[in-house]
Amino acid sequence: MLEQLKETVFKANLYLPKYQLVTFTWGNVSGIDREKGLVVIKPSGVEYFEMKSKDMVVVDLEGNIVEGDLKPSSDTPTHLALYRAFDKVGGIVHTHSVWATAWAQAGKEIPAYGTTHADYFHGTIPCTRPMTETEILGDYEKETGNVIVETFRNKDPMSIPGVLVHSHAPFVWGKDPMEAVHHAVVLEEVAKMAQKTLSISERTLPMDSVLLDRHFYRKHGQAAYYGQEKR
């Protein structure tokens, strides 16, 4: 079942240690088949280099295991909440990458200071509010997804494909699992650049909005011209 998606999700998970986004098993990638309403996700607590594509777990959008011998990631309810809310998202990544997680632990959003940021994120990368005691002690992972959805109530998740969960770490997404990993790598680099920028000048202001728009829309707008035409 969903063998091609399993292989894609498996390979996407292996990029997390390759790009130094995870330590031990501190992260996961998932992908969704929208037509079937099924999600493929990394198994919980399994080392990346011990996994096979057949170890990926298939669940429905309510979290029921449809196929797989292993338990799905403990973050599965968060992924599912995002898939239910963001209908254009096709892949999700969660990591504890050092620089992005540092911003999350500080409870700080990441302003757009330069064009590297603007090429992928159309504005500030938000940080969620702190979760309440009731949310933490209740259905914690599902509530983590809900607080992310709340944060994007007036934002386009495809224009800002990532978030920092307060006191936790980043969740990032894309149109498919590989794009989600790409965005996770970019988020980590942007977080590092932002912190280094502030270490040079703590009074640095966000970049000019005209420049922000130019860089974002040249890659993602209707008249985008960056890269090669698809044939």
From Swiss-Prot:
Its EC number is 5.1.3.4. Its cofactor is Zn(2+). It comes from the Bacteria. This is L-ribulose-5-phosphate 4-epimerase. Substrate binds at residues 27-28, 44-45, 73-74. InterPro entries: Aldolase_class_II_sugar_metab, Aldolase_II/adducin_N, Aldolase_II/adducin_N_sf, AraD. The active site is at residues 119, 226. The keyword Zinc applies. It comes from Halalkalibacterium halodurans (strain ATCC BAA-125 / DSM 18197 / FERM 7344 / JCM 9153 / C-125). SUPFAM superfamilies: AraD/HMP-PK domain-like.
